[in-house]
From Swiss-Prot:
It comes from Laribacter hongkongensis (strain HLHK9). This is Phenylalanine--tRNA ligase alpha subunit. The lineage of its organism: Bacteria, Pseudomonadati, Pseudomonadota, Betaproteobacteria, Neisseriales. The gene is pheS. Its EC number is 6.1.1.20. It catalyses: tRNA(Phe) + L-phenylalanine + ATP = L-phenylalanyl-tRNA(Phe) + AMP + diphosphate + H(+). NCBIfam families: pheS. InterPro entries: aa-tRNA-synth_II (IPR006195), aa-tRNA-synth_II/BPL/LPL (IPR045864), Phe-tRNA-synth_IIc_asu (IPR004529), Phe-tRNA_ligase_II_N (IPR004188), Phe_tRNA_ligase_alpha1_bac (IPR022911), Phenylalanyl-tRNA_Synthase (IPR002319), tRNA-bd_arm (IPR010978).
C-alpha cells in the first residue's frame, strides 16, 4: 500500500502549507470530498479480493484518520492565529492618556453680552440687575407710560397673576436703582425681556441691554459721544457712521433711534434719549438739578450682526451643531 502512504504524505504536506481557512477546506475537499482521492480509494475496496479487502481497508482508514487529525489541528492553528491578529489590532495601550471630556462653551448671546458689558465697564458703567416679573409701577407707571399706552395691550405684554407682567424691557432695573440711589448714577441693565412676538427676527423672549447716566449737566452730546464710541468699538470700525433720528418714547425727551451705516444701507440698532423729567420725579430725583440719558439695544440683534446669523430662532433651538461653531 505504498500508494496510500504516498497519498497521505502529499495530503499532510498540502495541509501544512495552507495559510487560510478557505484554502484548507479546498485541500480537505480534494482528499476527503465526494470525489476526493482518499474517498475514491475507499470506493475501490469492493473490487479487491476478499483476502486483501480487510488489510487494505484498515490501511486506508488509518490514513483518513491521520489526514483528518492534521486537518483539524491546522484549522485550530489558523483560527488561533486569526484571533491573535484580531486582538493585536484591537489592543488597548493602557499607558496612553484617557480621552478628555467634551468641553462646553458659552452661548453666542452670552458672548455678545459679555463683550458689550466689558466695553461699557471700560467707560465707567456698572452692571445692575432686577426681577423678570414686575409690577405695574416699575414696568409702566414710573416710566411715564400711561394706562392707555399701546404697550400695555394684551397683544404686546404677557400678564401674570396679581396684575404683574413679565417685564417688557429692562428699564424697571433702572427705576429700582434710581429709587435706591441718588446721582451720580451710571449703569447698564442687561437681561431677558418678554413680548408677544415671534418670527425670524423676533422672539417672545429676548435679551436687552439698557443704559442710564444721571448726573449734573449730562447732555445729549454726552449721549451721542458715548453710543458712537461704543458702536465703533463693538463693530471694530473707527470710521463707522452713526446717526440719531428723531423718535418718540414716553420715558425720554427728546428721543432718537440709533442707526449705523452697513453694506446694505442704514440699519437700526437701538433707541435712546434724555430721561424724561416725569421719570426723574417718579424716582425722587430732582429734574431741576439733574439730567440724564438712557438707551436700549437688543443683545440678540447685536449677536446676529456680529456672527452673521439671519434667523434669531436659531439661537434658541438648542442645536449643538449650530452653537458649537461660536465656541
Amino acid at each position: 500500500m505504498s500508494h496510500v502512504d504516498t497519498l497521505l504524505a502529499e495530503g499532510l504536506a498540502a495541509i501544512a502549507a495552507v495559510q487560510d481557512l478557505n484554502e484548507l477546506e479546498q485541500v480537505k475537499a480534494r482528499y476527503l470530498g465526494k470525489t476526493g482521492q482518499i474517498t475514491e480509494l475507499l470506493k475501490q475496496l469492493g473490487k479487491l479480493p476478499p483476502e486483501e479487502k480487510k488489510a487494505a481497508g484498515a490501511t486506508i482508514n488509518v490514513a483518513k484518520q491521520q489526514f483528518e487529525a492534521a486537518h483539524n489541528a491546522r484549522r485550530d492553528a489558523l483560527n488561533a492565529a486569526r484571533l491573535e491578529a484580531q486582538l493585536a489590532a484591537e489592543a488597548l495601550d493602557v499607558t496612553l492618556p484617557g480621552r478628555g471630556a467634551g468641553v462646553g462653551g458659552l452661548h453666542p448671546v452670552t458672548l455678545t453680552l459679555e463683550r458689550i458689558a466689558s466695553l461699557f465697564r471700560s467707560m465707567g458703567f456698572e452692571v445692575a440687575d432686577g426681577p423678570e416679573i414686575e409690577d405695574d409701577f416699575h414696568n409702566f407707571q414710573a416710566l411715564n407710560i400711561p394706562a392707555d399706552h399701546p404697550a400695555r395691550a394684551m397683544q404686546d405684554t404677557f400678564y401674570v397673576e396679581g396684575g404683574n407682567v413679565l417685564r417688557t424691557h429692562t428699564s424697571p432695573i433702572q427705576v429700582r436703582h434710581m429709587l435706591a440711589n441718588q446721582p451720580p448714577i451710571k449703569i447698564i441693565a442687561p437681561g431677558r425681556v418678554y413680548r408677544v412676538d415671534s418670527d425670524a427676527t423676533h422672539s417672545p423672549m429676548f435679551h436687552q441691554m439698557e443704559g442710564l447716566w444721571v448726573d449734573d449737566g449730562v447732555s445729549f452730546a454726552d449721549l451721542k459721544a458715548t453710543l458712537t464710541d461704543f458702536l465703533r468699538r463693538f463693530f471694530e470700525r473707527d470710521d463707522l457712521q452713526v446717526r440719531f433720528r428723531p423718535s418718540f418714547f414716553p420715558f425720554t425727551e427728546p428721543s432718537a433711534e440709533i442707526d449705523v451705516l452697513g453694506k446694505n444701507g442704514w440699519l437700526e440698532v437701538g433707541g435712546c434719549g434724555m430721561v424724561h423729567p416725569n421719570v426723574l420725579r417718579n424716582v425722587n430725583i430732582d429734574p431741576e438739578r439733574y439730567t440724564g440719558f438712557a438707551f436700549g439695544i437688543g443683545l440678540d440683534r447685536f449677536a446676529m450682526l456680529r456672527y452673521g446669523v439671519t434667523d434669531l430662532r436659531l439661537f434658541f433651538e438648542n442645536d449643538l451643531s449650530f452653537l458649537k461653531q461660536f465656541n
